[in-house]
UniProtKB/Swiss-Prot annotation:
Disulfide bonds: none annotated. This is Histidinol-phosphate aminotransferase 1. GO terms for biological process: L-histidine biosynthetic process. One of its GO terms (molecular function) is histidinol-phosphate transaminase activity. The keyword Ribosomal protein does not apply. It catalyses: L-histidinol phosphate + 2-oxoglutarate = 3-(imidazol-4-yl)-2-oxopropyl phosphate + L-glutamate.
């Protein structure tokens, strides 16, 4: 606390990121990083960009990167907004599109950065409970009276991993024509349906994605939004009032190459999905309740073992998983899908814990 702080600073409850320990030989299954490295073509592009041109500012419009993203997802380049990770994109979304004085709506169990943004920008919000089986119910997002100041939810949801079908998302968008609906698709490439094809049909729909998960570039920090030209223009106005150069030359080069290497993208995400199904079956065989997942993680609880204690005992064995001290989910563990060997080590450690 400092007397020099702006008044809002003392009211903030900042986001707590997943642990990034520096200890050697850890099996790190706590922050949903891809177990496979970036596309070799992305690494080559980064190396090629690391030359004399680094003395020059990058393209403030990121035209080449936006073009590569547009080609990969099937929209026009002027329907793409890029930022320094999807977290920065989301921060601009809250500033540009959600400050209407009316509550923004999002699930009670969801990405915990959403209420942080609301606190930072002094935006009122309303949480919408998930169903008893941890699903987002489109019927809960039907407007009642005054339009919401915005609607945002991950699909697949995080940390649950459950996904809505494209037609279910469209029901929410169609039912709220006077409200911007933001679909946070950080994990969509691991088995869910993207609603990117709907942005031409609905001018109130914005889709946010990242290269951190399925493109294995969490260390570069590149995210993007897809939407109508009017929504994208609003985001550009906020960005250029904050930082005109969010994407550096190395990140732009690597991200472009990653978006263009479809074969590597498909091969690695299919490998993650196959491992997820094997790990889910192994966890169920050990007595875990495992929610259906369309993400690169699973959300599981054991009826006879406390989740926090399990996380601690796994850590003693150099295996990190994520535990949330939050109502309704404090007995769940979120477990990132690692390599087959990492997931086998997890199952082996759990067997030893249960038998001890």
């Amino acid at each position: 606390m400092s007397r020099h702080w702006s008044p809002v600073v003392g009211t903030l409850s900042p986001y707590v990121p997943g642990e990034q320990p520096k200890l050697p030989d850890l099996i790190k299954l706590n922050t949903n990083e891809n177990p496979y490295g970036p596309s070799p073509k992305a690494l080559q592009a980064i190396a090629a960009a690391a030359g004399d041109t680094l003395r020059l500012y990058p393209d403030p419009a990121s035209d080449d990167l936006r073009g590569a993203i547009a080609a990969a997802v099937g929209v026009q380049a002027d329907q793409v907004f890029v930022g320094n990770g999807s977290d920065e994109v989301l921060a601009h979304v809250f500033m540009a599109l959600f400050r209407h004085g009316r509550p923004v709506r999002f699930p009670d169990i969801s990405y915990s950065f959403y209420p942080v943004y609301c606190g930072l920008y002094e935006i009122p919000y309303q949480v919408v409970p998930l169903t008893d089986d941890f699903r987002i119910d489109p019927a809960d997002y039907q407007p009642g009276g005054q339009a919401a100041g915005g609607i945002i939810f991950p699909n697949p949801n995080a940390p649950t991993g459950r996904a809505l079908a494209r037609d279910e998302v469209e029901r929410i968008v169609t039912a709220n024509p006077d409200t911007v609906v933001v679909v946070d698709e950080a994990y969509v490439d691991f088995g869910a349906e993207s609603v990117a094809p709907l942005v031409d049909r609905h001018d109130n729909l914005l889709v946010v994605q990242t290269l951190s998960k399925s493109r294995s570039l969490a260390g570069l920090r590149v995210g993007f939004a897809l939407g109508s030209r009017a929504l994208i223009d609003g985001l550009e106005r906020v960005k250029n009032s904050f930082n005109s150069y969010p994407i550096d030359r190395l990140a732009s080069a690597g991200a472009q190459a990653a978006m263009q290497d479809q074969a590597y993208f498909d091969r690695t995400r299919q490998a993650v999905m196959a491992t997820r199904e094997r790990m889910s079956a192994d966890l169920r065989a050990l007595g875990f309740d495992v929610l259906p997942s369309a993400a690169n993680f699973v959300f599981a609880r054991h009826p006879e073992h406390d989740a926090a204690q399990l996380a601690a005992r796994l850590r003693e064995r150099s295996i990190l998983v994520r535990h949330f001290r939050q109502a309704r989910i404090d007995q769940f563990l979120r477990i990132t899908v690692g390599t087959d060997a990492q997931c086998e080590a997890l199952i082996g450690a759990l067997k030893k814990i249960f038998s001890s």
